[in-house]
Design a protein with these regions (language model features):
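Conserved anion-binding
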Residues: 1-90
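Generic structural signal for well-ordered alpha-helices
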Residues: 7, 30, 75, 99, ...
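Short C-terminal domain-edge/linker segments immediately following a structured domain
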Residues: 22-23, 49-52, 76, 80, ...
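Electropositive phosphate-/nucleotide-binding environments in soluble metabolic enzymes
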Residues: 27, 65-68, 72, 96, ...
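Short acidic/glycine-rich loop or secondary-structure boundary segments that cap or lie
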Residues: 28-30, 50-55, 97-101, 120-121, ...
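Surface-exposed amphipathic alpha-helices with a cationic face
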Residues: 34-36, 79-82, 100-106, 158, ...
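A C-terminal functional module that forms or caps the active site or interfaces directly
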Residues: 89, 93-137, 141-142
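C-terminal helical cap(s) of enzyme catalytic domains, especially alpha/beta-barrels
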Residues: 124-133, 138, 144-169
Length: 169
């Protein structure tokens, strides 16, 4: 399948440690990735951009469950699919209420959190909502923290972000 070739390129050729993926093709579309047991796989669940609601907030019916937003269905499915304990979710830091709901569904799953910093996600709310198993991404706030994009300034901004994260735990 195409996803088998994507997974092979990502993990075997390029030697990535983790990847974000789209699960809209269902379980068959993520199996080629999850079979790499030492690699992290993060399913897009609730992205940080405003128009994520166009699809991710739509109510869906799956099996015998009552209608619920697609992001909750993805969270429930990710538990079923996490056979190798290498699956996580992408949940935007711009939606801490959604993060709280998803954390209730998946209490121990790793969550990649984009949207902190330039996109307006609140770091304090995000960490206080879910203090454990978060991987917080604040790329633009770190790389473009000052006009001088030197390694020293990037390192300084990364250390500052790390200190802020730890202060809210």
């Amino acid at each position: 399948s195409s996803n088998e070739m994507y997974a092979k390129a990502i993990f075997d050729t390029w030697k990535f440690d983790a990847s974000t993926i789209n699960a809209f093709g269902g379980e068959d579309s993520i199996k080629p990735f999850t079979k790499y047991q030492e690699k992290g796989i993060f399913i897009w669940c609730k992205s940080s951009n405003p128009s994520s609601q166009d699809f991710q907030d739509l109510n869906v019916v799956s099996g015998i469950q009552k209608p619920q937003p697609l992001y909750k269905t993805l969270a429930h499915k990710s538990i079923e699919w996490n056979l190798n304990s290498n699956l996580g979710l992408v949940v935007g830091g711009t939606y801490h209420n959604h993060l709280k709901e998803i954390r209730e569904i998946c209490p121990n799953m790793k969550i990649l959190v984009p949207g902190i910093g330039k996109q307006g996600g609140d770091l304090r709310q995000t960490v206080s909502t879910s203090p454990e198993n978060l991987i917080i991404s604040s790329s633009r706030s770190i790389i473009y923290s000052e006009n001088d994009k030197s390694n020293d300034n990037i390192k300084k901004a990364a250390k500052k972000m790390n200190s802020e994260i730890n202060s809210f735990r």
